[in-house]
Regions:
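Acidic, low-complexity, intrinsically disordered interaction modules
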Residues: 22, 26-107
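Residue-level detector of alpha-helical secondary structure
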Residues: 9, 13, 17, 62-69
Length: 109
């Protein structure tokens, strides 16, 4: 489990409030879950082995990252992928994500 600095928490929260979605990265390189902010910016929404929402505060974001996403080595900005039917890291460096046409969600391409 990664411990996040105050500066990292502030940066992630600022990006979330700008509309950037994050996903967790496990040690095997797989992207998991998603973290975003509600349209009113009052809540941080998350999905990872369940889903819920927390108040949009630094303390609640830290709890979320270090408790719910504790199996992740980091979190990174993500984008929706129709190909994967889910959020995947924008940075394609993570080896655990299959970008090939053999992915099970690719039909008839």
């Amino acid at each position: 489990m990664k411990k996040f600095t105050n500066a990292e928490i502030a940066e992630i929260r600022a990006n979330l409030n700008k509309g950037i979605v994050y996903c967790g990265i496990r040690s095997d390189g797989y992207g998991v879950g998603e973290i975003s902010v509600s349209p009113t910016k009052e809540y941080i929404r998350w999905r990872h082995f369940g889903q819920s929402a927390n108040k949009n505060t630094d303390g609640q974001l830290r709890w979320l990252l270090e408790t719910i996403f504790k199996d992740c080595i980091t979190v990174t900005p993500a984008e929706w992928s129709d190909y994967h039917i889910g959020y995947v890291p924008i940075d394609k460096q993570y080896k655990g994500i299959d970008y090939s046409t053999k992915h099970p969600n690719v039909c008839g391409l």
